[in-house]
Structure formats: structure tokens, C-alpha cells
Curated annotation (Swiss-Prot):
Other information: A lyase-type mechanism (elimination/hydration) is suggested for the cleavage of the lactyl ether bond of MurNAc 6-phosphate, with the formation of an alpha,beta-unsaturated aldehyde intermediate with (E)-stereochemistry, followed by the syn addition of water to give product.
First-tier enzyme category under EC: lyase
Annotated SIS domain residues: 53-216
Keyword rRNA-binding listed: no
Gene3D superfamilies: 1.10.8.1080, Glucose-6-phosphate isomerase like protein, domain 1
Protein name per UniProt: N-acetylmuramic acid 6-phosphate etherase
SUPFAM superfamilies: SIS domain
Family according to the record: Belongs to the GCKR-like family. MurNAc-6-P etherase subfamily.
Known role: Specifically catalyzes the cleavage of the D-lactyl ether substituent of MurNAc 6-phosphate, producing GlcNAc 6-phosphate and D-lactate.
Domain of life according to the entry: Bacteria
Gene Ontology process terms (BP): amino sugar catabolic process; N-acetylmuramic acid catabolic process; peptidoglycan turnover
Amino acid sequence: MNNSMTEARNEATMHLDEMSIIQALETMNAEDQKVPQQIHDILPKLAEVIKVTTEQFKQGGRIIYIGAGTSGRLGVLDAAECVPTFNTSTNEVIGLIAGGQRAMTVAVEGAEDSESLAREDLKHIHLNEKDVVIGIAASGSTPYVMGGLKCATEIGAHTVAISCNTNTKISDLAQYPIEVNVGPEVLTGSTRLKSGTAQKLILNMISTITMVGVGKVYDNLMVDVKATNQKLIDRSIRIIQDICDISYNQAQSLYESADQNLKVAVVMHLCDINKSEAVTRLNDNNHIIKKAIQN
């Protein structure tokens, strides 16, 4: 095996094929528990990243995840979830995966080995200096990710690298390198396991806390949720009910009178103003409810 931590053999699982099911489960669970602690150790560095993503997002910049295989799929997943959760557009948080949409379900031969493909993908979305490009690669040496970070640097965009090794190539190419050493995988080289878990937790933090910073959360409530189905409409009404301390029926009526805009409904009620005035207050206060009701 090579000297990459993500390719090293795990001493705890040398006899995985001889373990009982419960032994294998206990071993995997013990290994998985190491991941959050390793992430805890890099929280100060992650905070610096989120300061940048928040500020750039406020200025019209985008968060662009770029990766291959599992890493790419996790970036695409996080970007996709931002649309219903925070009512972002599909052009505000973007996930690029080597090989394109097809690579979400099947391996696209050679895609991750191409630096030029990353450049083409970033050119296609009109990468600019306001954007933040977050390269994700468990090994820290994926050419597709390296090409993306090089391209971003040339354009003047902010760059972040997330890897699960130490002293990685992508770390050398980024302004904000994040290295999480989760140790060897339970199944040697299968970075969909602990490495993938670490990446998912980190992306959860980046997107969630960035969206808190730009005003898409009130307390711990999703006040910018995009209500695209009955479950989310019901959630929106219950959020209004909770914030405004009114009945469900009152919240539903308020929601309808605000043209199903949760934030507008809340400001209308708490400030005792009409829809037009509520919209103006929100526009004047960067769409942050707490600022709108204070001013």
C-alpha cells in the first residue's frame, strides 16, 4: 500500500472477514466515533472558512463545491439540500462532480484524473472573484480538484481545500486548507466510510452556519424554507405559529395573506403592519427578521 493515510490498513479490522456481525458493527461504530473528535480539532480553521463564505455570499458570491467520486457526490448533495432548506437558487450553492451528473450514480472513467475538465466546468458556471471554491478530496491529491483550485486562484476567487490526509497537494493550492486525519478506513481505501462521514459533517457546518450568517435562520428555525410540498407548507405555518405565539389557524391565515412568504408573515404580525410595509422592512434589513422587527 502507499503511504497515504486513506490507503493505509486499519489494525482494528485486519480480521474483518472473520468477525461476527455484531463484532463488525461494534468495530465500525468505534471507528466512526473517532470522526467528530478529529473535526473538533479543526473547528478554528473551519470558522475562518465560514467567515469568508458568509461575507462573500452577502456580496453576491457563490459557494462552489468541487470533487470526484464520493467527495463530489457529497458536495452535490449539500448544494441540492440548500435549495429547499434555505430557499437558495441553484446558482448560489453549486456542486461540481468530475464526470458531471452521470457520475452521481456511475463511475466515469478518467474524469477525476483531468485537471482541464475542472477548468471547463468552472468556466461553464462563469466562476468569478466573488466566489468561494471548496475543493474536496479524501486523498488530497485528486487532479480534478487540483485543477479547480488552480483555476480559482488564477481568477482571484477564494479557495478552500478539505482532505482526510496530512500535508496534501490540495492544501498547498488553497488559502484555507482543512485537513482531517480520521485514520485508516475500516475497509482499506474505502473513503466513502470515515472520510466521507467527515466530509459530510464539515459541509453540513459550512452551509448551515453560512446561511445562519446571512439571515436565513431565526433562532434555530428555517425561516427561508422553500415550501414545495404540503409537508413544508405545514412546517412553514408551524414556524409562524411558534415565532408569533398564535394558533395554527391564525398562522395559516397570516401565511396566506403574506402570499406564502414566511418572513413577511412574521414581520407583519410582530410589527402589526401590512404586507407591503413588511416587505420594505425586510428589504431594508438584509431580509433578517430580528433586524426588521427592531428597526
